[in-house]
A protein has these predicted regions:
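N-terminal intrinsically disordered, cationic/polar leader segments
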Residues: 18-164
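N-terminal regions of proteins, emphasizing targeting and processing segments when present
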Residues: 11-12, 25
């Protein structure tokens, strides 16, 4: 939507007058947004720096919450930056995440074209692979784009696996 808020952008870069969309009851089926499966898969399986760990010293369950308030990535379709807060919330098992390597891992997303939904799921996969926690939840709270704010949450439980 342009700054005047009176046009919407359709596939192929065509602008549609918002009043015409309403008047003709144009739906999203009438507009080709141009997203492909290549866009959806882009960098979902990218190889990133290893997240290192250190031995947990306690047998009890306790929660570790790590926040990166200045997370950035790039939309694979538009090439525009995405900004957000990434929260890693986990209960360690035998290993804890080492913060410096985690920081370098997360910085790799800065210039990477990847959808927000893939970010939360990829970080979860890589955290689980690195430290095999009892439980982990990754939340990505992204700044609004086009007036819509996206909050993506992906979870893991060692007893139930991914999802419930």
């Amino acid at each position: 939507m342009c700054s005047a808020g009176r046009f919407i952008l359709g596939g192929g870069g065509y602008l549609f007058k918002f009043s015409e969309v309403i008047k003709h009851k144009m739906t999203t089926k009438d507009i080709d947004f141009g997203y492909t499966s290549d866009h959806a898969r882009k960098n979902a399986d990218a190889v990133l720096p290893e997240i290192q760990c250190w031995p947990n010293q306690y047998k009890r369950d306790y929660n570790i919450k790590i926040e990166l308030p200045e997370f950035t990535s790039v939309c694979p379709k538009t090439g525009l930056p995405d900004f957000g807060l990434i929260t890693i919330d986990y209960v360690p098992n035998e290993l804890c995440l080492e913060l410096k390597s985690l920081k370098f891992y997360l910085l790799e997303y800065r210039d990477m074209g990847i959808f927000m939904e893939n970010i939360a799921n990829k970080i979860l996969d890589d955290v689980v692979k690195a430290c095999k926690p009892k439980r982990a939840t990754i939340t990505g709270e992204f700044t609004p784009r086009g007036g819509l704010r996206s909050i993506i949450t992906a979870s893991y439980d060692e007893k139930e696996g991914y999802g419930k």
